[in-house]
Amino acid sequence: MTGTLPTQFKDSDLSPLTRPNTLGRFGKYGGQYVPETLIPALIELEQAAKEAWKDSSFNSELNHLLKTYVGRSTPLYEATRLTEHYRKNTLKGPRIWLKREDLNHTGAHKINNALGQALLAIRMGKKRIIAETGAGQHGVATATVCARFGLECIIYMGKEDMRRQALNVFRMQLLGASVRPVTSGTATLKDATSEAIRDWVTNVETTHYILGSVAGPHPYPMLVRDFHAVIGEETKQQCKQAFGRSPDVLLACVGGGSNAMGLFHSFVEDKSVRMIGVEAAGDGVETGRHAATITEGRIGVLHGAMSLLLQDKDGQVEEAHSISAGLDYPGVGPEHSYLKEIGRAEYAAVTDTEAIEALQLVSKLEGIIPALETAHAFAYLEKLCPTLNHNSEIVINCSGRGDKDVNTVAEKLGSEI
């Protein structure tokens, strides 16, 4: 498949399981908690998206670029040695498949959304683009599409994340983007998002904010999900070709939750498919130094949406911690909160140490170095595989490659580069 969002997912009359209501809510989650200045821009964006999906020329251009520029469709790869590792001569353990989003142009799933939103920005006449980034992959993807279309690009990135992801900072600059360090708060993704929103409020007439996850005010959770839905739709077709049916389990890491939502969306109404999101437990959930928002969070409002958040007893947003810059966020997309509440999706958390061990294992067994974010999903196989039988099929969203994380992993392992 080379296409974008399938036609059956554009219909506003879909079940509320797979679509927010007219107020932009998934159950009680979501909404628009933003300054009045931004409401017209959000209305304009939602309307532009609705019109674009109905426009054959928009879909044709997006499909063409997804195929020739991004490199879609991405393969569904059978991880035979990883499968053998977890079976260990027993009848337990599933067959493991990887949805190779790491093979996209720029090395992650992020470009699916960045490309789609850039085309919408052009459609709306907005030539100045801003974005937030944590691990740098969304920043690189945004800078890439801005270079492709000749758009001004400003990326907000926490100073701590710039230190951890120096390679991606230079990549963004090489692509012509202005990378603006954020020093407030923990100098990570939450603070970068806050600065991007402040910029947008000031420059809303000329600027489009390419938000990088299924978070933020409506219509962003829906919009970002829709641009990533191609992941799950390809997976559904590829599974039927590979083993004749839908998978038993879908597994993906969750920070804000865009890669997981892109994989899950096509399967939400198929109750035979388990959907599992894996959060960052950091130093351990019990230590308080983690980013396990769904596991430990409470309902609150952050960055324009109501969702589960990490909060202290007074309701103040707490600092998140993860070795992975892309998961180091104290909130989560509202649709994930909703899927958890209604019992449709499951969520677990793994530690920094477990993620690094999984990254090394996958690298040595499959010759694929996953991103630290993705490594959290791989790490959960240790607990999941012994519970699944030999005939089970599991698909992991390999959301990004780990080149950007080599220095961080080397430092953690005590190696010098």
Curated annotation (Swiss-Prot):
Enzyme Commission number(s) of this protein: 4.2.1.20
Cellular component annotations (GO), alphabetically ordered: cytoplasm
Gene name as annotated: trpB
Subunit structure, interactors included: Tetramer of two alpha and two beta chains.
Family: Belongs to the TrpB family.
Lineage: superkingdom: Bacteria
Pathway the protein acts in: Amino-acid biosynthesis; L-tryptophan biosynthesis; L-tryptophan from chorismate: step 5/5
Class in the EC hierarchy, top level: lyase
Pfam families (alphabetical): PALP
Name recorded for this polypeptide: Tryptophan synthase beta chain
Sites bearing N6-(pyridoxal phosphate)lysine, chain numbering: K110
Keywords attached to this entry: Amino-acid biosynthesis, Aromatic amino acid biosynthesis, Lyase, Pyridoxal phosphate, Tryptophan biosynthesis
Catalytic reaction(s) noted: (1S,2R)-1-C-(indol-3-yl)glycerol 3-phosphate + L-serine = D-glyceraldehyde 3-phosphate + L-tryptophan + H2O
Cofactor: pyridoxal 5'-phosphate
Record function comment: The beta subunit is responsible for the synthesis of L-tryptophan from indole and L-serine.
GO molecular function: tryptophan synthase activity
SUPFAM superfamilies according to UniProt: Tryptophan synthase beta subunit-like PLP-dependent enzymes
